[in-house]
């Protein structure tokens, strides 16, 4: 038997998803809780795998890990695990085939970036967004790793205005390192008049002298991963702690935003 967990986390509390010596990571926090509860003995023996290795500061509402459970498989449920985790919440569990791999079985991902409105020209940003849709070489909009194919397919980019900020939702089959954050910054630069739409088109055609830098990691969240035929289930008890923790973070952030907003008005 193999289990998969749907997990959410506050990326600002970690040095990224992947385990690293001497720093706190999402993967490390999950493995700590799973081994403490004797759900697994160690990540290698129990075939622990993750779907997306998000960078430091990047959050997730839907990431997935899988493992072969040990003697206490009965404890691998949200209502138990969430009492042993900090800044990470298990939102669902699914029994999956033995050959399941959370990275390679994913059929698509959706990211959301939360972008404060700086007086953008929305029409220009939407024109720029359309250029990214489809299949392109994204070398100019990624931090390339040796041997990785820079060609990717973006199925859609949707921008939604909510009060004083925009939600930029980007969906595709797979993404390169920092690709979403660099696309968002390209949209931002176009919206501010710092970059021409024609320049973005040229960059996608391989004509450029410098790359677009990534937008800050804190605005990005891995929103959804598509696994056809797999359903993650959890009950109200398991979600209760996640909801309470998220509301506390929301309340603190809103208080700080109000404080700094009033300070700006006085300057």
Residue ranges and their predicted role:
Residues 1-267:
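Structured-RNA-binding interfaces characteristic of tRNA pseudouridine synthases
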């Amino acid at each position: 038997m193999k289990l998969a967990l749907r997990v959410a986390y506050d990326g600002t509390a970690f040095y990224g998803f992947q385990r690293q010596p001497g720093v706190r990571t999402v993967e490390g926090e999950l493995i700590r809780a799973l081994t403490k509860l004797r759900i697994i003995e160690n990540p290698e023996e129990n075939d622990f795998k993750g779907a997306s290795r998000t960078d430091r500061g990047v959050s997730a509402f839907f990431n997935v890990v899988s493992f072969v459970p040990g003697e206490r498989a009965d404890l691998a449920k949200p209502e138990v695990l969430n009492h042993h985790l900090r800044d990470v919440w298990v939102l669902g569990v699914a029994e999956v085939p033995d050959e399941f791999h959370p990275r390679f079985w994913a059929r698509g991902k959706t990211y959301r970036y939360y972008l404060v409105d700086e007086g953008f020209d929305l029409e220009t940003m939407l024109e720029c967004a359309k250029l990214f849709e489809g299949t392109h070489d994204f070398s100019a909009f990624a931090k390339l790793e040796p041997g990785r194919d820079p060609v990717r397919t973006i199925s859609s980019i949707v921008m939604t205005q909510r009060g004083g900020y925009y939600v930029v939702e980007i969906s595709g089959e797979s993404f390169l390192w920092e690709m979403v954050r660099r696309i968002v910054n390209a949209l931002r630069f176009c919206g501010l008049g710092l970059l021409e739409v024609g320049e973005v088109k040229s960059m996608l055609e391989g004509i450029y002298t410098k790359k677009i830098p990534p937008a800050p990691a804190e605005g990005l969240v891995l929103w959804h991963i598509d696994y056809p035929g797999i359903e993650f289930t959890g009950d109200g008890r398991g979600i209760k702690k996640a909801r309470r923790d998220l509301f506390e973070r929301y309340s603190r952030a809103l208080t700080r935003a109000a404080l700094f907003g009033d300070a700006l008005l006085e300057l």
